[in-house]
Amino acid sequence: MLPVVALVGRPNVGKSTLFNRLTRTRDALVADFPGLTRDRKYGQAKIDEHEFIVIDTGGITGDEEGIDALMAGQSLLAIDEADAVLFLVDARAGMTIADEAIADHLRKQDKKVFVVANKTDGVDADSVCAEFYALGLGEVYHIAAAQGKGVRQMIEIALDGFFDDVEQEDDFSDLETGLEFVEEDEALLLKEQERLAALPIKLALIGRPNVGKSTLTNRILGEERVLVYDLPGTTRDSIYIPMSRDDREYILIDTAGVRKRKKVNETVEKFSVIKTLQAIEDCNVVLLIIDARDGISDQDLSLLGFTLNAGRSLVIAVNKWDGMTEYDKERVKSELDRRLGFIDFAKIHFISALHGTGVGHLYESVEEAYDSSTKRISTSILTRIMTMAAADHEPPMVGSRRVKLRYAHAGGYNPPLIVIHGNQVKKLADSYKRYLMNYFRRSLGIMGTPIRIEFREGTNPFAGRRNKLTPNQMYKRQRLVKFHKKSKK
């Protein structure tokens, strides 16, 4: 589960600057949900190989009414969702009444709170930050968010202990040179495939409020008549519900929470961005639910973007399809083709969660997506497919030399990662990379999951070596030198 960091503080202390620094906003998803989360923004950040979620809260004013209203309506919710709270203060402006009021609220929360003095560039940090120790929240950390000074060290301290148990990904560095590789044991690959097939499929139901997440969850559970209970260890109100269908085990991750029967028809659902983002990271397959009558919104695209960024398998359910006119149905299908053309690997189902129409077919696509994302494929098969792709459409020329593809192997799963080794492969045009991706997808029959391809240029294993001639070669060379000298006379 991704840890969550909340940025709290009065206006203009640099929360948004730090947020952008951590999330690298141009490269990472930044989900802004106006009207649903008020002024809170959510983004994904990364330090080395460790990822976490950042919440940027709105500023809190110093008046008593503003403190109570905004803290209760916005920042207090962000603090409740967070594993660590970064309380930002302005080192240049000094401590204010608003800072003291916020500190009073934070002391009442059972959270890890870190006082972060921003804008310490160009000043004596120890001197200007000394007064903030009076807030009674412990150590004061110095940063300059705009320049990135001290940010990394501060985050490492705040999230210390959260990544101790993170499993390391498989290391494929032994295949780097490409001189030789050991073919995988087909029996071991098959055994691993069978092991994964026996595991429950973790399926996250995500979507905007009121698209029918709870209705679909209860429809699925009602059809199967299973016992509903919460698995121990779940956090932040996401409900993990075990169930089975046709001898296949599932764990439904319901970000909206399971509703009692009397509340199924409620028109308003609680929406938590944090629960949704964490469910995406924790699941195997994402079921994105879209309201057919509203069409595709920017919020749908934000959720879709986070799903693709996480590399999760994807199935799309267009809900509330019943009762629509043929004209409206064609209009919705046209919009889907236009706006979702870049995810042609995901299957789209038109359903009615309320009446159960089309719900049964979702399982087939979910299983296909899971099996595709965890498919174990040998190096020989991947290399053979790569060779066929190059034979059907030769790699382009780079300068006076043609790009050469040497071999391919699996680099990871969920999503499938294919590593291609060769010469000048990093100079391949994006169009040819897409061609290879689509060729692998068709050849392997992979649907419902993105494929990632990584290109590696093998180093010359003989670089830096000096040729050592055998005695016989030395004798021949000496004779050639003598002959060359005689011919000049």
Curated annotation (Swiss-Prot):
Residues 3-166, 201-374 form the EngA-type G domain. GTP 2 binds at residues 207-214, 254-258, 319-322. GTP 1 binds at residues 9-16, 56-60, 118-121. Residues 375-459 form the KH-like domain. One of its GO terms (molecular function) is ATP hydrolysis activity. CDD domains: EngA1 (cd01894), EngA2 (cd01895). Pfam families: KH_dom-like (PF14714), MMR_HSR1 (PF01926). Signal peptide: none annotated. InterPro entries: AAA+_ATPase (IPR003593), G_ENGA (IPR031166), GTP-bd (IPR006073), GTPase_Der (IPR016484), KH_dom-like (IPR032859), KH_dom-like_a/b (IPR015946), P-loop_NTPase (IPR027417), Small_GTP-bd (IPR005225). Keywords: GTP-binding, Nucleotide-binding, Repeat, Ribosome biogenesis. Associates with the 50S ribosomal subunit. This is GTPase Der. It comes from Psychromonas ingrahamii (strain DSM 17664 / CCUG 51855 / 37).
